[in-house]
Amino acid sequence: MSDKTPPPTVWPTLRANDARALIRFLVDVVGFEETAVYGETDVVHHAELSWPLGGGIMLGSVRDDAADGPTPAGQCSAYIVVDEPDALCARVRAGGANVVVDLHDTDYGSRDFAIRDPEGNRWYFGTYRGAPRAS
């Protein structure tokens, strides 16, 4: 049976001083899946990483020649839904991630934690899936 889930239509984007190292961190430590990486040597022109539960991010190397001007590294913040935050928190700690908000239960029923990646971006993980959509 084929998956009828529509592809994501909102993609958080970020820039990195060392995009290849950030990709390795997000894939090997956090659990993103590498979907596409385009570039030469140390420069990543475009990369897409998918999250196993849906959605994804796009990223690339910091570039001074961007049409809209340079975007500094470390300016992204994202919330990512996870089914097992305790297991993920243990995994990222073991992988050397900088946990900046310890695992905790929120007053709105989620179990959350947060890390800062090597580029300075903040990643929040938790069980809150958002408010239900109006029908």
Annotate the PLM regions.
Residues M1-T13, I23-R116, G126-S135:
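Vicinal oxygen chelate
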